[in-house]
């Protein structure tokens, strides 16, 4: 045991005496990274500062309809009455989603799973779709 510990100490001292040089860092500034990713033209557009006046021109002048899409049908009907309501397709989709999210475990009784009827390999119907 003493022989192995005596050979271990000089080995540790040898490793501590050897100078270790780190690799040169590969960090580049943000301008070089943008130029490499997007090219010179797009990187100059991205790096230019934005005026608050430009942002104000893009924002609507008057407030729009409320943006909360609750699951209540009254909230969805209120959007169709407004002059700037969403498209009928989107509202129908949201109403359908609110109907399907209300289903609980009781609606899956009778062999119905998440995606309708499930038939096993042997032909028996199961409701283990979810």
Swiss-Prot record:
GO MF annotation, one: hormone activity
This protein's record includes keyword Secreted: yes
Positions of the pro-segment in this chain: 23-103
Annotated disulfide bonds: 114-130
Signal sequence interval, chain numbering: 1-22
Keyword Zinc listed: no
Compartments reported by the entry: Secreted
Top-level taxon of origin: Eukaryota
Region (Disordered): 57-77
Gene Ontology cellular component annotations, sorted alphabetically: extracellular region
Chief location bin: secreted
Gene Ontology annotations of biological process type: blood vessel diameter maintenance; cGMP biosynthetic process; receptor guanylyl cyclase signaling pathway
Keywords, ordered alphabetically: Cleavage on pair of basic residues, Disulfide bond, Hormone, Secreted, Signal, Vasoactive
PROSITE patterns listed in its UniProt record: NATRIURETIC_PEPTIDE
Job of this protein: Exhibits natriuretic and vasodepressant activity. Has cGMP-stimulating activity. May help to regulate body fluid homeostasis in a variety of aquatic environments.
Family named by the database record: Belongs to the natriuretic peptide family.
Annotated protein name in UniProt: C-type natriuretic peptide 2
Designated gene of the protein: cnp-2
């Amino acid at each position: 045991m003493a022989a192995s510990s005596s050979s271990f100490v000089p080995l540790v001292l040898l490793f501590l005496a050897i100078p270790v040089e780190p690799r040169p860092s590969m960090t580049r500034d943000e301008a070089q990274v943008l130029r490499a990713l997007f090219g010179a033209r797009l990187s100059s557009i991205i790096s230019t500062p934005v005026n608050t006046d430009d942002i104000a021109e893009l924002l609507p002048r008057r407030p729009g309809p409320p943006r909360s899409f609750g699951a209540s049908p009254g909230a969805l009907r209120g959007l169709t009455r407004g002059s700037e309501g969403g498209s009928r397709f989107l509202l129908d989709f949201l109403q359908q989603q609110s109907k399907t999210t209300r289903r609980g475990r009781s609606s899956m009784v009778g062999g119905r799973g998440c995606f309708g009827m499930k038939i096993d390999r042997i032909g028996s119907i199961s409701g283990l779709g979810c």
